């Protein structure tokens, strides 16, 4: 007698709701398949399902990582930084946590994040953890003509004509500042300088004749130079305004506010002089108007800050001060406490002295500030033993107070300085990571003409090259075809980044 027995697996599969109803052994095997990654000779092993958690990245996308596959060794080879890959692999294993190894510099780890295409979110998380300050986005106008004009006046490094305009602007600023200083020399001042309002017109009033004389000086050389400078500043400002991508954001930019401050005093002074009537002098209003004009003329000195638009050093200094406002606020607060404390102490220490130089606590504020900042003019000095002890403590406290926030400010300056220098180097250098496809000449011309801003164009060019890399990988997987392409790629990227 023959007894037919069912396979236990079949019986289990026949049960309703059993997990094997949807079980796919091939899919499970594929996800659990191990993959070997060789990083400059150091081999790492992980599972495909670990890498598949982030399919948009270089290692998570099978098509992207295929270009680095070595069929002879059955592994993926990357000639990259080995210590950094520990953190890169942990990013996949932990589900998105990115921690920089202590022995890897910031710039190298940032390059590794970009190479493995972990994405902007991972980069922002890394920068936030490292204390980086988020860079402001600087959009470009959508209109082609406005974009070219905006790049011409706003980005001197974008092209040759833009550099020429920047040089002209710097020369005009310097001429304006030199003229502002020279017109105050005694040899250039009129004998009636006290009645000289703006370098354009001056008025004299004679009591003996009870007459009013007005002498215009529109032919004065300083007025002509000032007018020419204002014409250039106004033209530059209006062109920037009409070509800017955002009219509302244009007036919130500190550089544009400086431009307005540099232009307005001229027109206010000119309008005041032209609108002033002779009878105003008899009514005693001339002195007040001249005082206002002197204050307005003083604002012209802020024109020197226009140089910061063309000076990376001044921009770095401004960014450092902006990032260090909290530390500077603490410094001023500590100095305020010290001034109140030591001015009060030196006043009471010198109170019994007959020839005391500290008649009151407010009078001692100046001495406390000078002593705490270690300037020490010597115009006010304590003479008693108690006053000298207070002065010694004041100087020591000032040194300690000023020294405490300085390292933080220096650290911020180093950060902005290195970020600026690294950005310039990055814009001039593209690292060859694989065998790219040479872009066609029309695309190359378009890349050179459509956008000429170094940093943003660099990112667009790099993205285009990466896309061509994927197309080329599908056509050629053999490494023998890479040598010539790499040579041509270096020449092309050098030509693109020389702008």
Curated annotation (Swiss-Prot):
GO cellular component: axon; axon initial segment; axon terminus; dendrite; endoplasmic reticulum membrane; juxtaparanode region of axon; lamellipodium; lamellipodium membrane
Keyword annotations from UniProtKB, A to Z: Cell junction, Cell membrane, Cell projection, Endoplasmic reticulum, Glycoprotein, Ion channel, Ion transport, Lipoprotein, Membrane, Palmitate, Phosphoprotein, Potassium, Potassium channel, Potassium transport, Synapse, Synaptosome, Transmembrane, Transmembrane helix, Transport, Voltage-gated channel
Record's bilayer topology term: Multi-pass membrane protein
Intramembrane segments: 362-373, 374-381
Entry-listed glycosylation sites: 207
Keyword Ion transport applies: yes
Motif (Selectivity filter): 374-379
Source organism superkingdom: Eukaryota
Region described as Disordered: spans on this chain: 1-26
Coiled-coil regions, chain positions: none
A molecular function (GO) term: voltage-gated potassium channel activity
Modification after translation: Phosphorylated on tyrosine residues; phosphorylation increases in response to ischemia. Phosphorylated on tyrosine residues by activated PTK2B/PYK2. Phosphorylation on tyrosine residues suppresses ion channel activity. Phosphorylated on tyrosine residues in response to CHRM1 activation; this abolishes interaction with CTTN. This is probably due to endocytosis of the phosphorylated channel subunits. Phosphorylated on serine residues in response to increased cAMP levels; phosphorylation is apparently not catalyzed by PKA. N-glycosylated, with complex, sialylated N-glycans.
Presence of the UniProt keyword Endoplasmic reticulum in the record: yes
Compartments reported by the entry: Cell membrane; Membrane; Cell projection, Axon; Synapse
Positions of modified residues (Phosphotyrosine): 429, 458
UniProt function note: Voltage-gated potassium channel that mediates transmembrane potassium transport in excitable membranes, primarily in the brain and the central nervous system, but also in the cardiovascular system. Prevents aberrant action potential firing and regulates neuronal output. Forms tetrameric potassium-selective channels through which potassium ions pass in accordance with their electrochemical gradient. The channel alternates between opened and closed conformations in response to the voltage difference across the membrane.
Misc. comment: The delay or D-type current observed in hippocampus pyramidal neurons is probably mediated by potassium channels containing KCNA2 plus KCNA1 or other family members. It is activated at about -50 mV, i.e. below the action potential threshold, and is characterized by slow inactivation, extremely slow recovery from inactivation, sensitivity to dendrotoxin (DTX) and to 4-aminopyridine (4-AP).
Assembly with partners or alone: Homotetramer and heterotetramer with other channel-forming alpha subunits, such as KCNA1, KCNA4, KCNA5, KCNA6 and KCNA7. Channel activity is regulated by interaction with the beta subunits, including KCNAB1 and KCNAB2. Identified in a complex with KCNA1 and KCNAB2. Identified in a complex with KCNA4 and FYN. Identified in a complex with KCNA5 and KCNAB1. Interacts with the beta subunit KCNAB1. Interacts with PTK2B. Interacts (via C-terminus) with CTTN.
Name of the protein described by the UniProt record: Potassium voltage-gated channel subfamily A member 2
